């Protein structure tokens, strides 16, 4: 399976756009900020993410899916959860831009 699915992010001051990357370049001209992509080894085509949720300790999380690479093929599509981090100027990112194999878990008290 050759899946080039990725999660990217852009911003706009207007709901109708234009949406731009971190450098202010138009996303419609293939400019965007990468949040998540496959690692080429274990995870293929991560994407279809949900909204970012915040747990009771103030940590942000993103739910998405990714295909598991197995025996030269695809072992199935799995639900995934990763911690979202933020740059100093407010752009979201996932550590190393790839799905994690292990990570902290969200904390919910109720």
Listing of model-derived features with the role each one plays in the protein:
Residues 1-110:
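Carbohydrate-active catalytic/glycan-binding domains of CAZyme proteins
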């Amino acid at each position: 399976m050759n899946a080039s699915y990725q999660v990217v992010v852009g911003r706009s001051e207007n709901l109708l756009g234009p949406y731009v990357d971190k450098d202010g370049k138009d996303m419609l001209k293939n400019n965007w900020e990468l949040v998540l992509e496959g690692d080429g080894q274990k995870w293929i085509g991560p994407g279809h993410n949900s909204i970012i949720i915040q747990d009771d300790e103030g940590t942000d999380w993103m739910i998405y899916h990714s295909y598991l690479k197995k025996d030269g093929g695809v072992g199935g599509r799995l639900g995934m959860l990763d911690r979202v981090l933020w740059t100093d100027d407010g752009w979201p990112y996932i550590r190393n831009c790839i799905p994690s194999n292990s990570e902290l878990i969200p904390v919910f008290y109720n």
